[in-house]
Regions:
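Secreted/extracellular ectodomain signature
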Residues: 24-215
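Bacterial N-terminal signal peptides that target proteins for export
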Residues: 1-9
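Bacterial N-terminal signal peptides
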Residues: 8-16
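Sec/Tat signal peptide C-region and signal peptidase I cleavage site
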Residues: 19-23
């Protein structure tokens, strides 16, 4: 087994993938190319606000949100999140920070096109993560000797895994820890407003979405 390499991602509930070798296996919703914009408020944006919104609408593989204070024109946006809920909540918190504590309203969200309209996605799985999951994680699982457990975890903006544990609990613990290392690295690279917004929520914590037991 090669040493574990935790993965950092750019400035992002999966459903169940059922195969016979999987002990606890939420189905993973692989999100394809394209995007959709969900408008929550019928508000005309200024030219500057529109240019900022255009930035998040270009990120087609991940989730983003845009919030606005209509009194003073302050705004906040997020992009590159694995989670629709976290992207929207963080956008509101960033906006309220820019608005000096005044309330902000969520104006819009940007979602991958494959997300069904009207559904909520606590975690999404982009094409990038699908490729990593299939080309790195699963092949490494197959190379392990019998009797070993593997786990795969994702957070708001990172992922991690372990494939050589003696029990399911140990595999989950290692996967979460590796994911959290990547989360911490990404938070250091983020703007202070984004770090504060994520830290104020539960979004920086990684969740195990896949556990594979001995076949």
């Amino acid at each position: 087994m090669k040493p574990f390499r935790f993965l950092t991602l750019p400035s992002c509930l999966a459903t169940m993938l059922a195969t016979g070798a999987h002990a606890q296996s939420p189905e993973i919703n692989f999100l394809g190319a394209g995007k959709q914009i969900v408008w929550y408020q019928d508000i005309a944006l200024t030219e500057v606000q529109q240019s900022q919104f255009d930035k998040i609408s270009k990120d087609i593989d991940y989730f983003g949100g845009f919030a606005l204070n209509t009194e003073n024109g302050a705004w906040g946006y997020t992009t590159g999140f694995f989670s629709q809920d976290l992207a929207e909540q963080a956008a509101v918190k960033i906006c309220e920070g820019n608005a000096r504590g005044r309330p902000c309203r969520l104006v819009a969200a940007v979602l991958p096109a494959t997300v069904a309209p009207g559904t909520r996605n606590a975690f999404g799985f982009s094409k990038y993560k699908e490729k990593y999951y299939k080309s790195e994680f699963l092949p490494e699982v197959k190379r392990q000797k019998s009797g070993r457990y593997a786990a795969f975890a994702i957070g708001s903006r990172a992922l991690g895994y372990d494939t050589n544990a003696k029990s399911a609990d140990v595999a989950k613990l290692k996967a979460r820890r590796n994911c959290e290392k990547a989360e911490a690295w990404n938070r250091k690279k983020s703007e202070i407003s984004v770090r504060n917004a994520i830290s104020a929520m539960d979004g920086q914590k990684c969740r195990v979405i896949e556990v594979i037991g001995p076949s």
